[in-house]
Amino acid sequence: MSEQKDRAAQIAAYMASDGPLTPFHGEVPPAPKWFTRTVAVQPENAFVEVEAAKIHYLRWGDRSKPGLLLVHGNAAHAYWWSFIAPYLAQDYNVAALDFSGMGDSDWRKSYSAERFAEEEMAVCEAAGMFAVSEPPVIVAHSFGGFITMLTGAKYGDRLAGTVIVDSPVNPPGRPGGPPHRTFKPHNVYPDMAKALSRFRLMPPQGCKNLYIVDWVARHSLKQVEGGFTWKFDPFIWQDFSIGDTAARLRETKCRIAIFRGAESILMPPEIGEYMFNLLGRAAPVVTIPEARHHVMLDQPLAFVSALNALLADWNHSVPNRRI
């Protein structure tokens, strides 16, 4: 309990400090050419209805190619993948979704892991990923990885595989999960500069690629009366349960791989080893050097290279067994 209290105090201090974008006063940080080139690639913007909610997704590439669904984490959105997707779209029909209550998707009165899993499958369907001979792969970060563990357990017979990115399944007795949350409406900030100054990565971490932090922060905001506020529903987690992630991991019906950031506070080596054992020591655990929890933000090009290598292996080999 004291560890949870200490963590909550650390997060409170982190949230009270100046955000990493404060020194830019609303200006866009300088970015390398690879980044400006990839985000200039315009995806298809589309929606699919799932249980009376419009689910937004972005899509890149040729629909005749194998499908690759990219899934964001807690309170995030599809644009977390928009500087990654164009590299993958050379070989895949790539889509990135906004879960309900996040990004540009509709909010719901209540949320569940099962409904989020349905949203993943609905976007795969809408993006044409089940219209080709090869089933799709889902790549999912953080909270999205927990949902994709359920998707792999329930719908894995329709998937070629899942890649779980820094989504820790903790052994019994190890403290885990978020600290106590306060549920209240978002603040409204008078201008974009002030709103950007309040953006933080969670769990607390730095990121040297501030041009990426700025990109995802801008796409996290919407204009409302009086200024700008966050897009995600602040009440998503009020009655939400993630369920038994260890059981779902073991029940996966398709190929699976685990990615972790070498410097991630959520997935130290022993957690990767624990998940490796849960999967019968038959699924790869890939470590991205110099990356913290937000692997794609910290080391985007290394992440692309590692993912392409994994997918190339999956495309040219037959698993000894389904995990």
Positions of PLM-derived features:
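Active-site loop/oxyanion-hole signature of alpha/beta-hydrolase fold enzymes
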Residues: V50-A53, L58, A95-V139, S305
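Gly/Ala-rich beta-loop-alpha elbow adjacent to hydrolase catalytic centers
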Residues: A140, G144, T148
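Flexible "cap/lid" loop of the alpha/beta hydrolase fold
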Residues: M149-A153, L159-M192
